[in-house]
């Protein structure tokens, strides 16, 4: 399978959690373009979080192969893989171990035997990248939801990973926090050239991505750019996904079924 343009590739992957259970993923094949933002979307139980676990090696395929930088992932190279892929979960509090924001970001570096002098340089830069340097001495528990997510992302950036997986990272945020995090994702992708993978059921968030992978009941339903995927609006609705607000409003106000961003909708009305 040609994986040249993808940093991660799933090739006919099947997975089940227990031998007597049905497949959680069935013959799943797709690629994650390097340096882009890919959003993996689907309703609850579609297999999104299972894919995230497979990407970071928490689980391994029952059948098929997963490639990272054209190299098939196996037990021999799994530890190396984990140095290149970081994950931020829905509730970052479950990841916090430090008494302060700075100490929490430094924790992963310490586990990787990074010297104290290097940590003194890396931690402030990572916090600056997510606009949290002024909160370095705060207790993580005192932060807002959006700020906690930024600190969790800083911890991943400090490790100089190539891929950041955001597993439902915006689902517990208010609209302002969600908007700020999405803006940060765009900036990190452009300035740091990292590959972003967001796991979500929110198509309004997914519309911000460069590329989409749509799952339905453990299988790939559709892949492509948002413009192409959302033009199949009726199909997405049939598999239990709510179309982005801008598209729903365009249908109601303009009678249009074409993909349109929120900014584009405002201009038309």
Curated annotation (Swiss-Prot):
Xref: Pfam families: ABC_tran
CDD domains, sorted: ABC_cobalt_CbiO_domain1 (cd03225)
Record EC number: 7.-.-.-
SMART domains per the UniProt record, alphabetical: AAA (SM00382)
A GO-annotated cellular component: ATP-binding cassette (ABC) transporter complex
SUPFAM superfamilies named among the record's database cross-references: P-loop containing nucleoside triphosphate hydrolases
Family: Belongs to the ABC transporter superfamily. Energy-coupling factor EcfA family.
Function: ATP-binding (A) component of a common energy-coupling factor (ECF) ABC-transporter complex. Unlike classic ABC transporters this ECF transporter provides the energy necessary to transport a number of different substrates.
Complex formation: Forms a stable energy-coupling factor (ECF) transporter complex composed of 2 membrane-embedded substrate-binding proteins (S component), 2 ATP-binding proteins (A component) and 2 transmembrane proteins (T component).
This protein's name: Energy-coupling factor transporter ATP-binding protein EcfA1
């Amino acid at each position: 399978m040609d994986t040249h343009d993808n940093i991660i590739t799933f090739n006919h992957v099947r997975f089940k959690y227990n031998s007597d259970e049905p497949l959680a993923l069935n013959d799943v094949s797709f690629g994650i373009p390097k340096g882009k933002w890919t959003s993996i979307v689907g309703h609850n139980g579609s297999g999104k979080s299972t894919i995230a676990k497979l990407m970071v090696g928490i689980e391994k395929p029952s059948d098929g192969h997963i490639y990272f930088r054209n190299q098939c992932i196996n037990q021999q190279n799994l530890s190396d893989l984990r140095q290149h892929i970081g994950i931020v979960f829905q509730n970052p509090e479950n990841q916090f171990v430090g008494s302060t924001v700075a100490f929490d970001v430094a924790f992963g570096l310490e586990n990787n035997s990074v010297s104290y002098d290097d940590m003194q340089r890396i931690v402030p830069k990572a916090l600056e990248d997510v606009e949290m340097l002024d909160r370095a001495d705060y207790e993580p528990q005192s932060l807002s939801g959006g700020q906690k997510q930024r600190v969790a992302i800083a911890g991943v950036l400090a490790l100089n990973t190539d891929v950041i997986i955001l597993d439902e990272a915006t689902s517990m945020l208010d609209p302002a926090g969600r908007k700020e995090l999405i803006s940060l994702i765009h900036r990190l992708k452009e300035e740091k050239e990292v590959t972003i993978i967001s796991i979500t059921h929110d198509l309004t968030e997914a519309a911000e991505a460069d590329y989409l992978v749509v799952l339905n009941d453990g299988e790939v339903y559709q892949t492509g750019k948002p413009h192409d995927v959302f033009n199949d609006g009726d199909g997405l609705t049939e598999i239990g996904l709510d179309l982005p607000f801008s598209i729903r409003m365009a249908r109601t106000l303009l009678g249009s079924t074409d993909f349109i961003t929120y900014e584009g909708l405002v201009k038309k009305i």
